[in-house]
Amino acid sequence: MAKTQSDNCLPVTVLSGFLGAGKTTPLNHVLNNREGMKVAVIVNDMSEVNIDAELVKQDGALSRTDEKVVEMSNGCICCTLRDDLLKEVRRLAEDKRFDYLVIESTGIAEPLPVATTFDFRDEDGQSLSDVARLDTMVTVVDAVNLLKDYSSQDFLRDRAKTAGDGDDRALVDLLVEQIEFADVVVLNKAGTATREQLDLARRIIAALNSEARIIEADYGRVPPGAVLDTGLSDFERAQTHPLWFKELNGFMDHMPETEEYGIRSFVYRARRPFAPMAFNAFVNKPWPGVIRAKGFFWLATRPNFVGELAQAGALVRTSKRGLCWSAVPRERWPDSAEWRASMEPYFDNTFGDRRQEIVFIGLADQMDEAAIRAELDAALTGMVDRFTPDAWKHLLDPFPNWEQQAA
């Protein structure tokens, strides 16, 4: 598993997972079974004292002089410590003493910003990708508590776990980010979970990321080859991992994996606007069996705007996505034949690019597609063949004022 001569870049595994999932135990297990590899570790903890780094050191996994733990405390590597991360990874890569680097991020870090650090090129034209190669994104989840946490309406501040003032993220949003962007998901504490907890945990992971390899583990005992030097990470491909993205963009190769876990999905599409009150009622009612929903919507009272819907677990959010291209003067459109060709399928002679397009992903035995479609159809308004925004102005609209929000 050591680097070949043709691979001059230091391979890197990024280890993520919410606090309490047990990230440090698989890290220590891998380090104690690394088959002669010289491994450097960067450990990031949000506390003043880097507890995870101390656990790694006390375990004795890196006791040799040719290996090293780099501590990065009191900050999150996806934000405040990005510059420090760049410097440390570059220094370790240029040192040429290590076969591999493992970055254990804080439990409240999202993996995507960490991954983008490797493609970031500074003002001097230097990039981590010149000396290091992002090899595997690993997320560790707690098999016992995943369903409870995924169904929670808690914010990180409710758990006293934030990246600082202004961190208003919900717990489920962080879990979704960590799972959707992973190449490998370690389902830790599998032996402690009930059969039902384990089954639902697998199904949640498959519903969020049909590409991820799921590895069940106890006490973090993960084969090193499952998380080191896998060659799985591909930044552009990783952005298509989420199952909702595949559905909205017509990817069909995910079906066998999702069927194996009893997951099904569908896309609701329509070319008429929603009546705001009716759509708001739908948004605020339970959706049995739905694990994830994401997409775009059009309200009759807001003919120039695209709305975005995002649901995960018990939380549903709606927000302004931006202006419809139909509402933007053509002289401001991108001057690209490729862009125009890509947008052509979305344009209609009557409504332009205004449309409803929402993907629903859920448990095959619980999600009622027909009922969801019927409720959304009932929320539509307007004539099928006519764009009449003036006729819809009188409709009551309970959604926040998008005109006052920054674009």
Predicted feature locations:
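Short, aromatic/basic amphipathic alpha-helical patches
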Residues: 54-59, 202-205, 372-376
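Conserved strand-to-helix beginnings and helix N-cap segments that scaffold or border functional pockets
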Residues: 53, 82, 112-115, 195-199, ...
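C-terminal accessory "lid"/substrate-recognition subdomains
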Residues: 2-4, 48, 146, 152-356, ...
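Nucleotide-state-sensitive switch-loop elements of NTP-binding domains
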Residues: 2-173
